[in-house]
Amino acid sequence: MDVKLSEIITVSSLVKKYDNKFLALNALNLNINQGEIIALLGPNGAGKTTLISTICGLTSITSGKIEVNGFDVIKDYRKTREIIGLVPQELALEPFEKVINSVRFSRRLFGKKDDNKYLDQLLIKLQLFDKKDNIIKSLSGGMKRRVMIAKALSHNPSILFLDEPTAVVDVELRKEM
């Protein structure tokens, strides 16, 4: 029996041209089905981060259309962001905040109520539970990357984008992730 998976991301004729006229994405079409795991591979400047940023609604598009779970990323921005978790390339953390407070804050940004059990389990899986009351500034680079992953998963999204997720993460944890 042939099982058809539902499309969760649809990118149609996507064009992204930056102000300096650099063409980052040219008439890109892409369909991603629910449950699929994909990797974007290519050299620096190939448009991988630009594609992720446009799907997440963080970068404007020049033309084309992007839908996430049937919602337009421009018209239904909040709806699509609730569905997506994003771990960006750059570490963007509050250096003087405790790990748990930073993760909890990210969850609240999506209108989710506190769920200490869920957040504790998340921190356990990412080997951060014993660091949850530590100030982020005191963590290693790999631990900071894992805090970013915890923040991205804090609101329990259906879709997770990892832009360079294993940068500065030690080899053993990379295997587990």
How should each PLM-predicted stretch be described?
Residues 43-47:
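Walker A (P-loop) phosphate-binding loop of ABC-type ATPase nucleotide-binding domains
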Residues 64-72, 79-80:
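Conserved ABC transporter NBD signature motif
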Residues 104, 108-131:
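Conserved ABC ATPase "signature" region
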Residues 135-139:
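Conserved ABC ATPase signature
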Residues 156:
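Conserved catalytic motifs of ABC-family nucleotide-binding domains
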Residues 160-163:
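Catalytic Walker B motif of ABC-type/P-loop ATPase nucleotide-binding domains
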